[in-house]
Amino acid sequence: MFASTWQTRAVGVLIGCLLDVVFGDPKRGHPVALFGRAAAKLEQITYRDGRVAGAVHVGLLVGAVGLLGAALQRLPGRCWPVAATATATWAALGGTSLARTGRQISDLLERDDVEAARRLLPSLCGRDPAQLGGPGLTRAALESVAENTADAQVVPLLWAASSGVPAVLGYRAINTLDSMIGYRSPRYLRFGWAAARLDDWANYVGARATAVLVVICAPVVGGSPRGAVRAWRRDAARHPSPNAGVVEAAFAGALDVRLGGPTRYHHELQIRPTLGDGRSPKVADLRRAVVLSRVVQAGAAVLAVMLVYRRRP
């Protein structure tokens, strides 16, 4: 049906992206949730307070997922490679769920339902919402939408386009492990080191591609491409993450808001440098961030297909 591997991959990536747009994440039996439960079970066996144990834990899980992806990609059948690529891409994406949650938090904050917004925030990020009021919840949600524009939208598409099913599933495994154990808490400071470093590597190029797309797409929401570039160049390196800082700074500059500052997690309070030099974000800015995130995903889909065609024989 399809003439070559590159056509198969391009069609599969586009179908996977459309499945995410139309259906979002499945409510039950999501592959990422199943992987997370398996990882938690394995951690009961592999956990030791050291980097080597953490590297073994990550290697076993990411290796298993990569081998599964390679096997799925090589199953016989004329339509199977497209179906495998589409399914893997869909499973790795989370743009629709991200946008839905961002809009829901916006709605709750506009109704001054701070308690409900606090309950919903953990589905976006690992912040401790207990002490956050409306402004803090708005900033936390906007920063999470920005960071996850890369993690849950752009980067999976680029891995799927460049290297197929094993790569996109492996990437999602790495990113999930980072969200589970890549913390600087007493338990995970050493055990989670490998997951955090591997996630930094896996997102490095994609985060910068995301920032470029933010610059290009900023005018769609009345944003400033020049402001995005300025904040990216000036502020990104101040962020503790080499990748999240790039994307969050670009969003801050594009939307003319100021992000960063005191950031409380369950295990620690971080005093982060500010990103951007605009106003404190309002609920309307969170809504703009959600729209910008969706437009960036559409741009990433186009970029992914271009990448596949560029790599064809």
From Swiss-Prot:
Any idea where this protein resides? Cell membrane
What are the annotated GO cellular component locations?
plasma membrane
Q: What is the native source organism of this protein?
A: Mycobacterium tuberculosis (strain CDC 1551 / Oshkosh)
Source domain of life: Bacteria
Q: Where does it mainly reside?
A: membrane
Q: Which family does it belong to?
A: Belongs to the CobD/CbiB family.
Give one Pfam hit by family name: CobD_Cbib
Q: Does the keyword DNA damage apply?
A: no
- Membrane topology according to the record: Multi-pass membrane protein
Q: What does this protein do?
A: Converts cobyric acid to cobinamide by the addition of aminopropanol on the F carboxylic group.
Cited InterPro entries? Cobalamin_biosynth_CobD/CbiB
Its keywords, alphabetically, are: Cell membrane, Cobalamin biosynthesis, Membrane, Transmembrane, Transmembrane helix
Ranges annotated as spanning the membrane: 52-72, 79-99, 154-174, 204-224, 289-309
Report the record's Gene Ontology biological process terms.
cobalamin biosynthetic process
UniProt name for this protein:
Cobalamin biosynthesis protein CobD
Pathway annotation from the record: Cofactor biosynthesis; adenosylcobalamin biosynthesis
The answer, when asked if Membrane is one of the entry's keywords, is yes
Which molecular function GO terms apply here?
Answer: ABC-type vitamin B12 transporter activity; threonine-phosphate decarboxylase activity
